Amino acid sequence: YYEEYVDGQGMVVR
């Protein structure tokens, strides 16, 4: 599965 989290720049990384 893909974990969603916010990158240091505020981007949503999947």
From Swiss-Prot:
Tissue: Nacreous layer of shell.
Protein name (record): Uncharacterized protein IMPP17
Organism: Nautilus macromphalus (Bellybutton nautilus)
